[in-house]
């Protein structure tokens, strides 16, 4: 049901010209699960896992999304345990019509993975700073690389909007159920609603919404 809701909303938004489907930005965020919540046998949710991000440990799941490069609207949602590597889930987030895929440095090497062997897209993955930090900062090559990375970052920033909407506007910061299936279904519905939220001003401009 949840994927169908997302598909219907996105079909409507695409009809209104709000999703061009020329490129996809992929990203993921951790959704916390209460580590103290246990079932009647005293066990934590076996589908949730612990992961380390920076110097902090988190317990829960990950929401992986694919978003339109122009509008930032979400077209694919995939849920996994928190310890699953982001780069392994990209195939679940693409609609197949994009000509470019944008992602942060955590997705380095994605283009070499077997599942993307015949995928004809331009991979716009953020370069790790270490790949150009040793260059002379006054050189044209360094300045060009910095400018390219800045442009990539501006594009990737759009994928943060739906995460912010579900966490701040909708107050979704922790999983509500046990297991990945139910929580992924709820996340998919929330991202579908976040698309309407993010497109509301443009829809009002088209006379599609009334205040």
Ranges and model annotations:
Residues 1-122, 128, 188-194, 202, ...:
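Polybasic low-complexity intrinsically disordered regions
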Residues 99-100, 105-185:
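Helix-centered, glycine/charged polyanion-binding patches within enzymatic domains
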Residues 70, 171, 197:
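Residue-level marker of positions within ordered structural domains that often coincide
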Residues 143-147, 152-153, 190, 197, ...:
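Acidic, contiguous segments within the catalytic cores of piggyBac-derived transposases
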């Amino acid at each position: 049901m949840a994927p169908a809701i997302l598909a219907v909303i996105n079909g409507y938004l695409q009809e209104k010209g709000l999703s061009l489907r020329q490129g996809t930005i992929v990203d993921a965020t951790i959704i916390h699960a209460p580590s103290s919540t246990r079932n009647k046998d005293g066990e934590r949710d076996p589908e949730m896992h612990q992961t380390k991000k920076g110097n902090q440990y988190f317990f829960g799941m990950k929401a992986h999304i694919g978003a339109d490069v122009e509008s930032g609207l979400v077209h694919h949602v995939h849920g996994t345990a928190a310890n699953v590597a982001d780069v392994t889930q990209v195939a679940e987030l693409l609609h197949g019509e994009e000509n470019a895929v944008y992602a942060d440095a955590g997705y380095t090497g994605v283009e070499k993975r077997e599942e993307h062997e015949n995928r004809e897209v331009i991979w716009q993955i953020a370069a790790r700073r270490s790949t150009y930090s040793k260059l002379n900062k006054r050189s044209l090559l360094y300045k060009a690389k910095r400018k390219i990375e800045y442009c990539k970052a501006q594009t990737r920033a759009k994928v943060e909007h739906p995460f912010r909407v579900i966490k701040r506007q909708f107050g979704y910061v922790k999983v509500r159920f046990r297991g990945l299936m139910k929580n992924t279904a709820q996340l998919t519905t929330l991202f579908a609603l976040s698309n309407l939220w993010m497109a509301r001003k443009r829809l009002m401009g088209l006379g599609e919404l009334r205040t």
